[in-house]
Every structure is written in structure tokens, then in C-alpha cells.
A protein has these predicted regions:
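Anchoring transmembrane alpha helix of integral membrane proteins
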Residues: 1-82, 160, 322-323, 329-367
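Hydrophobic alpha-helical transmembrane segments
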Residues: 2-21, 30-34, 60-67, 85-109, 141-158, 205-209, 212-219, ...
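Alpha-helical transmembrane segments and their immediate interhelical loop/hinge regions
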Residues: 7, 145-257, 262-268
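Hydrophobic transmembrane alpha-helices
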Residues: 36-40, 71-72, 160, 232-239, ...
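Juxtamembrane membrane-interface segments in integral membrane proteins
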Residues: 46-54, 76-154, 167-168, 173, ...
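Membrane-interface starts of transmembrane alpha-helices
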Residues: 53-65, 117-124, 183-186, 226, ...
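Hydrophobic alpha-helical transmembrane segments of membrane transport and translocation systems
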Residues: 265-367
């Protein structure tokens, strides 16, 4: 018996609202659990390699995978923290430079338009003291990307170990919990999710390296101080669509304006716009692929809802969660339309983008 469209839609919406409410209540546990799930899927091929090729027992392969993950995370955080510390040490000097530049600008305006300067400068001074005096909060935002407490990392590492060690048991449970007739489709969905998650995370890592490298090189050529710091920050925050590069670009433009003048800050702004266009139209399609692409409407909604539910970590997790949801909807009878509306409209006649790098190397857009 097929349910009427209104009943089916109402059922889906009720399930989504109920699930969303439960997710909000359990964000302290579910946020690190979801992060650990993503990392476990990424490290599963490495663990399988250790077990099949090197004959490692399950526990030992899990430990080696865990150590590799810790080394990667510690390396990234150590590098970023040291760079952030150098930047934080110069914030008082930056405040003085900003005040000097603004004062000269206001002075010229005052002379031309006879506007009282003292009250404006007092207001600006208080604003800068509040903004730059809270450097700990600024760095806390960039360094505490996933959570404001250390419990997130502790929970994540524990969940990562358990999920990776019991991955076959969890996989068997996910299959056996359904009726026999549905198991082939469930297995197909799980395999697709694994493939898409690995493709997405590896693509994000490549995107982080490419965008961070391009921005660092661009700022270094312009002579901007802390070019590497701003490049890494841009690559890291670029994981958050639209908002990430806007935030990091705004910081870089303000810094360039305060230290190098208006002309160079305009060049930096134009450069960020060009880099974003390159990232959206060349880097993202080739390193991530269209199957993970979520349209702008649902990306923005996902960012807003994710931030309201889980804070900053929710903004990071919103896109992979929507990608998983999209795959599930596309493979369930009657819910295909929900999966289609989340993604892009795909034209059957549209050809994949190709770029001839060399005679033997061709860069082709991923599915």
C-alpha cells in the first residue's frame, strides 16, 4: 500500500524534526562520534592494508591507524598554534598601525569637511581595544575549530578506536538489521557512502593544500607578513563553504590595509576573489567531484542549521552529513526527489571538464 503524497511528506518532515531535536540534545556525544566515523572510514583502507598484506591482527592495525591520525592532527595543530602565537604577539603593534592609518585618513577628511575628530577617534579607539584586546577569543575561534573543550578530542579518539576495531561487526549489524529483501540495497548504500566519504575527505585535504599553497604564495609575492599563516588559515576555513574564505579573506585584507596601505589591500581582495573563483570552478570539481556537491541553497541552510545545532563543528559537518543524506534518499523508493533537490541539476548531455596538462597528462572532472 502506497501512502498519499501528503502523508509521506508529513512523515518525512516529522522524522527529520524529531531526529534534529535528538541530535541537538546529544551534540556532546554525537559531534565527536560523527567526526570519528568520518576518520574511521578514511583510515579503513590503511587498516585493511596492514591486516591483509602485513598480517597485522585487528587490534594492532587499529593502534597503528590511531597513531597515524594522532601524528597528523598534532602536526597540523602544532604548526598552526606556533604561527598563531607569532601573530598574536604582533597584535598590539597591529592596533597601533591601524590607529595610525585611520587617524591620518580621518585627519584628511576632517580638514576637508570640518568634522570633529576627537569623538570619532575615541569611539574607534574603544572599538579597536575591544576587538584586538580579545585576541584570545579570535585565536580560540580558529584553534578550537571542532569544539571549545578537550573532551571533543578525547571522545573522538576513543570512538575512532572502537569504530575501526569493530568495523566489521558494525557493518554486519547495519546489513542484518533489515529484511532479507532489502539487504542488497542497504549494502549498496553503505558502499556508496564509504566511497563518497573517502572521496570527500581526501578531496578536502587536497583542496586545503592547494588553496592554502596558492594563497600563501600570492601573499608572499606581495610581501605580506605572515603569508604562510594566512594561507593555512584560508585553506583550513575554506572547508566551510562561502563563509570560511570570506572570514579569512577579511582578516587578511584588514591586516594588509593596516601594514601595507589601501592599494595593496585592494590587490589582496581581488586576489582572494580570483582564488575563490578558481577553487569553485576548477579545484573543487576535480578533487571532490559532483556526487558530493550540494547546491548553494542547501549548503547555506546546512551551515546555518549546523551552527545552531552544534556550533562551529556543525558548520564543518553539515556538508558531509548532507552528502550522506543525499545518497540515502537517492536509493530509497519514493524519496529520490529529496536527494535530487539537495544536489545539482545534472544534464545528461553535459560533458566532463578536461584540461590538458601535458601530452600524456589530462586532468578530468570527477563524477
Amino acid at each position: 500500500m502506497r501512502l498519499p503524497f501528503v502523508s509521506k511528506t508529513a512523515s518525512v518532515l516529522i522524522c527529520i524534526i524529531t531526529l534534529g531535536y535528538l541530535v541537538i540534545l546529544g551534540h556532546t556525544i554525537l559531534s565527536p562520534l560523527f567526526f570519528a566515523f568520518l576518520m574511521a572510514v578514511l583510515f579503513t583502507p590503511f587498516a585493511n592494508l596492514l591486516e591483509r598484506k602485513l598480517r597485522f591482527p585487528r587490534g594492532l592495525s587499529t593502534i597503528f591507524s590511531f597513531l597515524l591520525l594522532v601524528i597528523c592532527l598534532v602536526g597540523v595543530f602544532y604548526f598552526f598554534i606556533t604561527q598563531s602565537q607569532h601573530f598574536a604577539d604582533d597584535l598590539p603593534k597591529l592596533r597601533i598601525q591601524i590607529m595610525d592609518v585611520v587617524e591620518r585618513g580621518y585627519l584628511s577628511i576632517t580638514q576637508e569637511m570640518n568634522i570633529e575628530l576627537s569623538q570619532q577617534m575615541d569611539f574607534l579607539q574603544k572599538g579597536l581595544d575591544k576587538l584586538l584586546g580579545s585576541s584570545g577569543e579570535i585565536l580560540g575561534f580558529t584553534l578550537s575549530i571542532f569544539s571549545s573543550t578537550g573532551l571533543f578530542l578525547i571522545y573522538s579518539m576513543l570512538f575512532f578506536i572502537f569504530i575501526l576495531n569493530y568495523r566489521r561487526l558494525l557493518y554486519k549489524f547495519a546489513i542484518d538489521v533489515f529484511d532479507e529483501k532489502h539487504r542488497p540495497k542497504v549494502e549498496k548504500i553503505i558502499m556508496k557512502i564509504q566511497k563518497i566519504i573517502k572521496q570527500y575527505i581526501i578531496g578536502l585535504l587536497l583542496q586545503f593544500i592547494l588553496v592554502g599553497g596558492i594563497v600563501s604564495a600570492f601573499l608572499f609575492v606581495l610581501g605580506i607578513k605572515y603569508a604562510l599563516f594566512f594561507g593555512i588559515l584560508t585553506g583550513l576555513l575554506n572547508v566551510i563553504p562561502y563563509l570560511g574564505i570570506t572570514f579569512s579573506g577579511g582578516m587578511t585584507i584588514v591586516f594588509a590595509w593596516a601594514t601595507n596601505g589601501v592599494d595593496l589591500s585592494i590587490v589582496v581582495m581581488i586576489g582572494y576573489v580570483v582564488i575563490h573563483i578558481i577553487d569553485a570552478n576548477i579545484i573543487l570539481p576535480f578533487v571532490v567531484g559532483s556526487k558530493v556537491k550540494i547546491n548553494a541553497l542547501f549548503s547555506f541552510l546546512g551551515l546555518i542549521i549546523g551552527e545552531k545545532m552544534w556550533g562551529i563543528s556543525g558548520m564543518f559537518f553539515s556538508i558531509p552529513f548532507l552528502a550522506i543524506l543525499k545518497i540515502i534518499f537517492e536509493n530509497i523508493d519514493g524519496l529520490e526527489a529529496w536527494g535530487q533537490i539537495i544536489g545539482y541539476e545534472i544534464s545528461p548531455r553535459k560533458q566532463k571538464k578536461k584540461y590538458q596538462i601535458t601530452k600524456n597528462i589530462v586532468l578530468e572532472e570527477l563524477d
